[in-house]
Amino acid sequence: MAERAPRGEVAVMVAVQSALVDRPGMLATARGLSHFGEHCIGWLILALLGAIALPRRRREWLVAGAGAFVAHAIAVLIKRLVRRQRPDHPAIAVNVDTPSQLSFPSAHATSTTAAALLMGRATGLPLPVVLVPPMALSRILLGVHYPSDVAVGVALGATVGAIVDSVGGGRQRARKR
């Protein structure tokens, strides 16, 4: 049987992998981001450290950790409902192990976006611009998510982050004014 040619999202993934996988440090960085974001544990640790190190901003850091966790949990729930399988094409190299075969949406992209939005609020820094693109790209480079999994994960994370901010963090800022 002839090997099927990459089309659609698979072709995008193949193009990303072809362009980036051999660049020095790219694969190692993508794997590091993957491990950091697994079950949103890196974001939870960072939020806890922020809450300890910056007591005046403790609430904002705890809200950021809670938001990342909630975003991750929602993404996992959606994965279990949708049950889309991870990319499976001979032209795609899978460059990291995953805890499940479910793909949609990317929980890494979801929790990273929520964490970046909420930690950006805590620090006053534009963290979504700095943190979200590398994590999103890493999911495609590693061959574990279709681009649509990542895009929906980013949108979901932004939505959850905004809701958590309005419920948990927004009231605190309003009182400080």
From Swiss-Prot:
EC number per UniProt:
3.1.3.111
Q: Which residues form a coiled coil?
A: none
Q: Where can this protein be found?
A: Cell membrane
Q: Which GO terms describe its cellular component?
A: plasma membrane
Predominantly, its location class is membrane
One Pfam family for this entry, by name?
PAP2
Task: List where the protein spans the membrane.
Answer: 35-55, 62-82, 124-144, 150-170
What is the stated purpose of this protein? Phosphatase involved in the biosynthesis of decaprenylphosphoryl arabinose (DPA), which serves as the arabinose donor for the biosynthesis of arabinogalactan, the major mycobacterial cell wall polysaccharide. Catalyzes the dephosphorylation of decaprenylphosphoryl-5-phosphoribose (DPPR) to decaprenyl-phosphoribose (DPR).
Q: Which PANTHER family match?
A: DECAPRENYLPHOSPHORYL-5-PHOSPHORIBOSE PHOSPHATASE RV3807C-RELATED, SPHINGOSINE-1-PHOSPHATE PHOSPHOHYDROLASE
Please state which protein family the record places this protein in.
Belongs to the PA-phosphatase related phosphoesterase family.
Quote the protein name from its UniProt record.
Decaprenylphosphoryl-5-phosphoribose phosphatase
Q: Where does this protein come from, organism-wise?
A: Mycobacterium tuberculosis (strain ATCC 25618 / H37Rv)
What is the phylogenetic placement of the source species in the record? Answer: Bacteria, Bacillati, Actinomycetota, Actinomycetes, Mycobacteriales
